[in-house]
Amino acid sequence: MKFSEMTYTRPDIDALLARCKELAARAAAAPDGEALVKLYYEQSEAFAEYNTASQLANIHYTCDTRDAYWKAEQDFFDANGPAVTNASVEISCAFLANPHVDALTKAFGTTCVAGMKNAVLGMDDRTVELQQQFNALVSKYQQVYGGALVELDGKQLTIPQLGPYKEDLDPAVRRAAYEAEAGYFDAHRAELDELYGQIVQNLNQQAKVLGYKDYSELSYVRMNRIGYGAKEIKAFRDQVANDVVPLLQKVMAMRAKRTGIEHPAFTDLPVMFKDGNPKPIPGYKARMDAARTMYHELSPETAEFIDFMQDNELFDVESRPGKMSGGYMTSLPSYKAPFIFANWNNTSGDVDVLTHECGHAFEGYVAERDPHVPADLECPGMESAEIHSMAMEFLTAPWHHLLFGKDTDKYALLHTEDSFVFLAYGCEVDEFQHIMYQNPDLTPDQRNAEWLKLEKKYRPWIDFDNLPFYGRGAGWQRQLHIYECPFYYIDYCLSTMAALQFFLLSLTDHKDAWERYLRLVRRAGLASYTELLETAGLKVPFEDGSIKGIAQQMTDWLEAHQV
């Protein structure tokens, strides 16, 4: 069914909550493992209608945050979502209390029961009101960000539409673009500072209600991290700071030499080449035709997937006023349909987001069609889900010429370099959030000072050159994840470590790399992060020294492929 034909009906929350009670009672009383497994499939499907309605509302709202009808529907789900989540937790409690619960591990692997335990430990009826308040705060942030229009070049532009100006070869144009963006954020400084302070206090309060020291501790449960915790994440960040950052300084020196910008300021960093950054082919249809060819030639599975996506209007990727910034993939379970949202701005990032979100959507498409996989185990933890997307960016490389033509080699260098350099920024965001939630009484200026300290630790090559907003250490406020989904961002780093390994494998044997990727995808949410890496024969990045060799290989490749 085409997206435009999908009908929306606000769900009956009372009926759903009553169904949840009935399912919980049956789960507690299930007489044997076989009955419990059957019931698990049933409860998983019970939320399909609600989740479909919720995602339809969110898609329409984020496509136009000014639409009063969809704003009201988004408010409805913000208000009722916590009660539904907690009703789901009650079902998990009932499964866990059943003496035959081990049957679920036998049927579905290690993540099912561990995930239910995390759900139970991370939610409680006592936090419903706080969760509702948090949802409302996030919606306010989305309105501030999504409503951004700035004046530049005689035009009213959204934040994503500033992208091409930030990459312009004229340094004055780049600076003007950053200053226009900075002006908007500075104008909303008090509001953004207050919103973040309220979010930190809210989530820390939720953590205390549930018996945790602060939200940084609770986040490991809420993010459903299975088999590792804060100790392993710190070890990972330390490796990046000690083993990767020195190599990144070498990489950034290569970039400066390549561009001829001897002492690059922050506003110079988006320029990757003397003659300008690679540009994808123009036009929505031309790009979509290229994507169809690319995925048809990659594999039979991706051919079927891309036809389904394009034939059913499951892309909304062009930027326009009122549309929320960023990109995402979500699922509409009643239709077994992924949906991709993005904001193209005629930079190479348009191809990044296309291949990235198609990686998420491809995994969702495959999992939704596997009868063995229950609906709520279709997707693994976020650190694993991001492997699907980030690896797809690299595994489509043999077809990037369809989207870049003569700029293909430039894009290969830009994309690979950016992915490698990203590790430092991702760890910076994660450490910053740990500091914020462990020190909730920091003033806005103190928060910004902490960010600037971390900039020196993880990205010592940056010179803000008195740039407004960024120069005072507030640049983190334009990172959606810090407000919307705290502690998610490190997942991109963990998945990048897998994606870089897929990239290195593909250099010598693309077919083998793709087959490993497909094995990983087909395990859906039935395996943990470390188990998925083992499935694909990849290194786990928590052990000391595990990153260094990969980082050196990446640096060597970049040095050999300077354009």
Regions found by a protein language model. Give the residues of each.
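Inter-helical turn/loop segments and adjacent helix faces that build the functional surface
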Residues: A230-K231, M254, R258, L298-E301, ...
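Post-HExxH zinc-binding segment in Zn-dependent metallohydrolases
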Residues: N242-D243, E368, C379-D407, H415-T416, ...
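Glycine- and acidic
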Residues: G122-M123, E179-H188, Y228-K234, L269-P280, ...
